[in-house]
Amino acid sequence: MNRPVLDEKHLHPGIRQLVAALHRDAIQQVQTAIHSHSVVVVGMDSNPFVRKARRALDAAGVAHEYLVFGGYTSQWRRRNALKMWTGWPTFPMVFVRGMLIGGAAEVQRLIAMDELKGLLEN
């Protein structure tokens, strides 16, 4: 997969460091969690799709770490940085053994097809 990202040479030298550091703390928080936990759900308050993913994991008996990045009116810039980092357009972002598997629909599909267990066992 080759996802287009603006080449650094097309950024003015005066803003390169700013762009590189933009909300890096949020990205590092997620990276730390996915290295420490088998399943990580990255979400936001009051999002029904985040709730669906977490409920599906709970019903399947899958323990998971949950990271909350604000709600509809807060921390949207940090969430946007996570979207740009992963390329995934919505929340939740569900990681299994460090791999982004998608959101609520993808979690539900993997559970229904009994594929999530295989990802966790490998």
Predicted regions and their residues:
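N-terminal leader/targeting and pre-domain segments
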Residues: M1-I34
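Non-catalytic, surface beta->alpha helical segment in thiol-disulfide oxidoreductase systems
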Residues: V96-N122
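Local sequence-structure signature of Cys/Sec-based thiol-disulfide redox active-site neighborhoods
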Residues: D25-L67
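Structural micro-motif
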Residues: T86-V96
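Amphipathic alpha-helical interaction motifs in eukaryotic regulatory proteins
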Residues: V42, R51-R54, D58, K83, ...
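Short beta->alpha junction loops
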Residues: L67-T73
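Structural motif
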Residues: T73-N80
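Short amphipathic alpha-helices and their capping/turn residues within compact interaction modules
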Residues: V39, V62, G87, A112-E115
